[in-house]
Swiss-Prot record:
Protein species of origin: Salmonella typhi
Record keyword Cytoplasm present: yes
Reaction catalysis annotation: tRNA(Gly) + glycine + ATP = glycyl-tRNA(Gly) + AMP + diphosphate
Record EC number: 6.1.1.14
Broad class of the protein's primary localization: cytoplasm
Enzyme class of the recorded protein, top EC level: ligase
Pfam families the UniProt entry points to: DALR_1 (PF05746), tRNA_synt_2f (PF02092)
Protein's name in the database: Glycine--tRNA ligase beta subunit
UniProt-annotated location(s): Cytoplasm
Length: 689
């Protein structure tokens, strides 16, 4: 069967830059699934994405589905014919459904009996006939949160569509996709190359688009070119470009023909905190800041044009003129804000609502101040500095700089606090109170910052849960999932001695009578333990290991982490699977027991050698392991408990638990309950698979 290259390109108006990659990758994944479901043999499915196009190129696509044999089993012979050998109604109905008579059916004989059988050969459908619907289906499944309509048609897509190219080898596949008749016409760059041209063969893509249309369709190639050219441009001026992955992705999604240029701004603006300047350059203008080798910001920036200009200096000057007023604004705000102390903004917090039922930002500040001090006392941080940081924590939200450049919240608080002469750990805490902001983000660097960050997040969790506004589905307007995980990460990774029970109770207490949810403490803790589940799954822990620890509901995050590591290590031991199975068996036996058990195992009632030996081991281990459990040395404890495998196996092989004599039966059940209690000091091992 011959093979050809298939090309589909959807030419559009400018696609959303932050969604471009996901659209292209989803298009490729959807179409690959369509090919595989149809049984069409194919080679690599390569995706292309540029601001005004999505495309796929499929190598070595078979021209048709393979012919295949189908078999359809009918009734057993005993049910297919009556005593006189005439076909039954069941047999005739089956044959009619297959398009044959009963006489035309074959016989299938196996060691289990004999059946009627229909066998047929189906010719594979041509690829050309299948492709239009496969493309349409793949596009319809794209993750587009908001669709557009254009013109008078009822067609919906992420952006208006102007061209659809469908080529199998050199042949156009006739189809109407998204309201556009397929053709071999492709549009080039808006301002360079040929605005429109035809492509003769799918193999010419994407090279023909680069040569004639001045468009680099390969997303990764554009991104790599921007990165390499920006690094070289920064090197030429003695610096290093800030090429964050997210901004690289966005810029690569904005240009079809990237041209990297270097511009500058007045050195006087360097007196403004670099974070504000960088916010303007990266956030507003999509520029790459440049830093010297010592980490200081240089008065330069790198940007990417979408055109090769005969006069690049004109483009450079234009971008410098655009950014200058924004930097001047930042300079003005910085100088104006410093004319008063950060603390002077406290009264204005009373005018800003945190949440209608929970009060203003000033109310939140008072709670954070108290909670940060309480946490500092628990973890051995400077209580005075923690309460001071709590008092100032939201003051920068009232400054001109943060009002205009919202992403500078926290960091500007740090700069203004330093200007006011606040303690350094207080200033740093104001910056780090929102950390970690995302997965993998840095944690607060000092104990005061940890206390403030936890206090801020716990106040939000307690308040929002306290009025019954739990996150539902994808809706989490107060970012409670991120807040919960942030608290857990700080406590675990900084090894802080904090208990979620007392921490949540204190956060709730500070709200007074504002909260209406009576179960708020349990709700918050359950929610946070649920975040633990997601965290440890991301870390590669098995679901049943997590379940085994969650079953004990440990509320000290550092303790939870120690149990997780202990159970994970326990699973590597040779004895683990047998002991997990034994724990499961014990759990089932105890669940069925209806008689009250003894407080202790009575040695005088023990009869069999195996139960006497198991009881002896339990007494020895109980005394030995108490310090292990008290110190959280769970891994060592489970290693010791692994020695129970042999006596437990002997017990179940040689001892009848449910003996007829009541005293013996209850004593043996008590023995098993003591065995289970030892393991439950760490986790519910019976849940391990």
């Amino acid at each position: 069967m011959s093979e050809k290259t298939f090309l589909v390109e959807i030419g559009t108006e400018e696609l959303p830059p932050k969604a471009l990659r996901s659209l292209a990758e989803s298009f490729a994944a959807n179409f690959t699934a369509e090919l595989d479901n149809a049984g069409l043999a194919h080679g690599t499915v390569q995706w292309f994405a540029a601001p005004r196009r999505l495309a796929l190129k499929v190598a070595n696509l078979a021209e048709a589905q393979p012919d295949r044999e189908i078999e359809k089993r009918g009734p057993a012979i005993a049910q297919a014919f009556d005593a006189e050998g005439k076909p039954s109604k069941a047999a005739e109905g089956w044959a009619r459904g297959c398009g044959i008579t009963v006489d035309q059916a074959e016989r299938l004989t196996t060691d289990k009996g004999e059946w009627l059988l229909y066998r047929a050969y189906v010719k594979g459908e041509s690829t050309e006939a299948l492709l239009p619907n496969m493309v349409a289906t793949s596009l319809a499944k794209l993750p587009i949160p908001k669709l557009m309509r254009w013109g008078a048609s009822d067609v919906h897509f992420v952006r208006p569509v102007h061209t659809v190219t469908l080529l199998l080898g050199d042949k156009v596949i006739p189809a109407t996709i998204l309201g556009i008749q397929s053709d071999r016409v492709i549009r080039g760059h808006r301002f360079m190359g040929e605005p429109e041209f035809t492509i003769d063969n799918a193999d010419q893509y994407p090279e023909i688009l680069r040569e004639r249309g001045k468009v680099i369709a390969d997303y990764e190639e554009r991104k790599a070119k921007i990165k390499a050219d920006a690094e070289e441009a920064a090197r030429k001026i003695g610096g290093n470009a800030d090429l964050s992955e997210s901004l690289l992705e966005e810029v690569a999604s904005l240009v079809e023909w990237p041209v990297v240029l270097t511009a500058k701004f007045e050195e006087k603006f360097l007196a403004v905190p670099s974070e504000a300047l960088v916010y303007t350059m990266k956030g507003d203008q999509k520029y790459f800041p440049v830093y010297a080798n010592d980490g200081k910001l240089l008065p330069n920036f790198i940007f990417v044009a979408n055109i090769e200009s005969k006069d690049p200096q004109q483009i450079i000057s234009g971008n410098e003129k655009v950014v200058r007023p924004r930097l001047a604004d930042a300079e003005f705000f910085f100088n104006t804000d410093r004319k008063k102390r950060l603390e002077d903004n406290l009264p204005r917090l009373q005018t800003v609502l945190f949440q209608q039922q929970l009060g203003t930002l000033r109310d939140k500040t008072d709670r954070i101040q108290a909670l940060a001090g309480w946490i500092a006392e628990q973890i051995g941080a400077d209580v005075n500095h923690a309460t001071r940081a709590g008092l100032l924590s939201k003051c920068d939200l009232m400054t001109n700089m943060v009002f205009e450049f919202t992403d500078t919240q926290g960091v500007m608080g740090m700069h203004y606090a330093r200007h006011d002469g606040e303690a350094e750990d207080v200033a740093v805490a104001l910056n780090e109170q929102y950390q970690p902001r995302f997965a993998g983000d840095d944690l607060p660097s000092n104990p005061v910052a940890c206390a403030l960050a936890i206090a801020d997040k716990m106040d939000t969790l307690a308040g929002i849960f306290g009025i019954g506004q739990h996150p539902k589905g994808d809706k989490d307007p107060f970012a409670l999932r991120r807040a919960a995980l942030g608290v857990l990460r700080i406590i675990v990774e900084k090894n802080l001695n904090l208990d979620l029970q007392t921490l949540t109770e204190e956060a709730v207490r500070l709200y007074g009578d504002k909260l209406t949810n009576a179960s708020v403490v349990d709700d918050v803790i359950d929610f946070m333990l649920g975040r633990f589940r997601a965290w440890y799954q991301d870390e590669g822990y098995s679901v049943d290991t997590i379940q085994a620890v969650l079953a004990r509901r440990p509320t000290r995050p550092a303790d939870f982490d120690a149990r997780m590591k202990a159970v994970s290590h326990f699973r590597t031991l040779e004895e683990a699977s047998a002991l997990a199975a034994a724990n499961k068996r014990v759990s089932n036996i105890l669940a069925k027991a209806t008689e009250p058990l003894n407080d202790i195992v009575h040695a005088s009632v023990l009869k069999e050698a195996a139960e006497i030996e198991l009881a002896r081991h339990l007494v020895v281990l109980r005394d030995k392991l108490q310090p292990y459990f008290a110190d959280g040395r769970y891994q060592e404890a489970l290693i010791e408990l692994a020695a129970l495998r042999a006596p437990v196996d002997e017990f179940f092989e040689n001892v009848m638990v449910n003996a007829e004599e009541k005293d013996i039966r209850i004593n043996r059940l008590t023995l098993l309950s003591k065995l289970r209690e030892l393991f439950l000091q760490v986790a519910d091992i019976s849940l391990l698979q």
